[in-house]
């Protein structure tokens, strides 16, 4: 005789059989499908976690490398600036040395020129004195007309010019 369940006429054997099959299916699903599926899900979760950890480590390493590169770039800039400053100082020192050498050479040339001018002046004065003496002798000889010998006149004029030169 069929048993009524919730107002439907379903035989009890069918209900028991369906329940047994359902439970058997659950056990089989748990053993053969749910377990492996959960294992795969667990493995996938671990894999994703490992990938995230690896990505975080890679990100941290990349940040560290970027910071190191920035430091190296900063250090390179500092070294380049120091090199430029040293080159500028060396150029200024070299310029000062060249200017000093040029001034020294100019002073030497100037002193040499002054000495040359002095020597030329002395030679010109000596030549002029000779000419003046010679002219004086000629004039005196015409004026005196041989009262004194020519040698005595030259000596007399030279002595006179010498005295005049020393008096100045």
From Swiss-Prot:
Q: How does it sit in the membrane?
A: Single-pass membrane protein
Q: Which of UniProt's keywords are assigned here? A: ATP synthesis, Cell membrane, CF(0), Hydrogen ion transport, Ion transport, Membrane, Transmembrane, Transmembrane helix, Transport
Entry's transmembrane regions:
9-29
Query: Which residue windows are coiled coil?
Result: none
Gene Ontology terms, cellular component aspect?
plasma membrane; proton-transporting ATP synthase complex
The secretion signal range is none
Major localization class: membrane
Q: Name one GO molecular function term.
A: proton-transporting ATP synthase activity, rotational mechanism
Q: Where in the cell is it found?
A: Cell membrane
Return any one Pfam family short name. ATP-synt_B
Query: What SUPFAM superfamilies does its record include?
Result: F1F0 ATP synthase subunit B, membrane domain (SSF81573)
User: Which HAMAP family has this protein been placed in?
Assistant: ATP_synth_b_bprime
What's this protein's family per the entry?
Belongs to the ATPase B chain family.
Q: What does this protein do?
A: F(1)F(0) ATP synthase produces ATP from ADP in the presence of a proton or sodium gradient. F-type ATPases consist of two structural domains, F(1) containing the extramembraneous catalytic core and F(0) containing the membrane proton channel, linked together by a central stalk and a peripheral stalk. During catalysis, ATP synthesis in the catalytic domain of F(1) is coupled via a rotary mechanism of the central stalk subunits to proton translocation.
Q: How does it assemble?
A: F-type ATPases have 2 components, F(1) - the catalytic core - and F(0) - the membrane proton channel. F(1) has five subunits: alpha(3), beta(3), gamma(1), delta(1), epsilon(1). F(0) has three main subunits: a(1), b(2) and c(10-14). The alpha and beta chains form an alternating ring which encloses part of the gamma chain. F(1) is attached to F(0) by a central stalk formed by the gamma and epsilon chains, while a peripheral stalk is formed by the delta and b chains.
Instruction: Write down what this protein is called.
Output: ATP synthase subunit b
UniProt source species:
Bacillus cereus (strain AH187)
């Amino acid at each position: 005789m069929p048993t009524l369940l919730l107002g439907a006429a379903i035989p009890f054997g069918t209900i028991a059989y369906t329940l047994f099959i359902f439970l058997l299916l659950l056990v089989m699903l748990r053993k053969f499908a749910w377990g492996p599926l959960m294992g795969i899900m667990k493995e996938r979760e671990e894999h994703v976690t490992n990938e995230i950890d690896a990505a975080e480590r890679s990100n941290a390493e990349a940040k560290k490398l970027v910071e190191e590169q920035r430091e190296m770039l900063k250090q390179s800039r500092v070294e380049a600036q120091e090199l430029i400053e040293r080159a500028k100082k060396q150029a200024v020192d070299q310029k000062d040395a060249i200017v000093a050498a040029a001034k020294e050479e100019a002073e030497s040339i100037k002193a040499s020129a002054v000495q040359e001018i002095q020597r030329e002046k002395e030679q010109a004065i000596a030549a002029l004195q000779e000419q003046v003496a010679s002219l004086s002798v000629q004039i005196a000889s015409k004026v005196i007309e041989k009262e004194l010998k020519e040698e005595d006149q030259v000596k007399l004029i030279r002595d006179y010019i010498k005295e005049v030169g020393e008096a100045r």
